Design a protein with these regions (language model features):
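Short, conserved catalytic or interaction motifs in soluble domains
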Residues: 68, 120, 167, 181-184
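DNA-recognition element of transcription regulators
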Residues: 104-117, 150-160, 172, 185-204, ...
Length: 225
């Protein structure tokens, strides 16, 4: 799981990241809303952790910006604000969950994992049908107009991540961790080669799709205009 953390308090940021790393997850920490918003243009995360009070803006303002851009990444607020009105306001603006500082490590991890599972369940865990494509995670197989295509396991996993997120810009780091794992020593060039192979193997352009390369950011699967 890859987690983006918006937190200006160093001690709380360390608490959150240590809990994540000890459990085998990765994270990036941003101390201001401006730096976080800049990063969200190029980075991709499974879950976001937002503080409320920040040096330059509020976590609510950051959340509004994300939702206005139709970014549906699950959001957990971790804040010292603890009134019922605070919780209601965060949820009303699109937060998915709420924890009061300091969070207990086990509860923090449990809530983050639950948010990730919920997002994955909405994306679908069975056969994924997108246009003429059918992806079956149970057999790591993909069919195009009913024809079984010959893909390696890595090629299939990469295609599945892309087709589960059509229209979403996925960072290179996110794709590397999603397909090759957190600790894999894989160069970004390997990812680029796999993307190039997928374009041909899936016959994307002939079937109304393309994988758009966004310079210095990553890739986006999108329908042809």
């Amino acid at each position: 799981m890859r987690v983006g953390v918006l937190e200006d308090d160093v001690d709380h940021a360390v608490l959150i990241t240590q809990a994540l790393h000890a459990d085998g997850h990765s994270s990036e920490v941003y101390p201001t809303g401006a730096r976080f918003l800049q990063a969200m243009v190029r980075e991709t995360f499974d879950v976001l952790v937002l503080d409320w009070m920040l040096p330059d803006m509020t976590g609510i303002e950051v959340l509004d910006w994300l939702r206005q851009l139709e970014d549906r990444t699950p959001v957990l607020f971790v804040t010292s604000r603890d009134t019922e009105n605070d919780i209601v306001e965060a949820l009303r603006h699109g937060a998915d969950d709420f924890l009061v500082k300091p969070p207990r490590r086990t509860e923090l991890l449990a809530r983050l994992k639950a948010l990730k599972r919920r997002a994955e369940s909405f994306a679908g865990v069975g056969v994924l049908a997108v246009g003429a494509f059918e992806f079956d995670p149970s057999s790591s197989s993909v069919r195009l107009h009913g024809e079984l295509l010959d893909l390696t396991e890595r090629q299939f996993q990469l295609a599945l991540v892309l087709f589960r997120n059509p229209g979403r810009l996925l960072s290179r780091q996110y794709l590397l961790e999603a397909v090759w794992g957190l600790n894999a020593q894989v160069q970004t060039r390997t990812l680029d080669i796999h993307v190039s192979q997928l374009r041909a193997l899936l016959r994307l352009s002939d079937n109304g799709w393309r994988i758009n390369s966004v310079y210095a950011h990553g890739y986006r699967l999108e329908p042809l205009a």
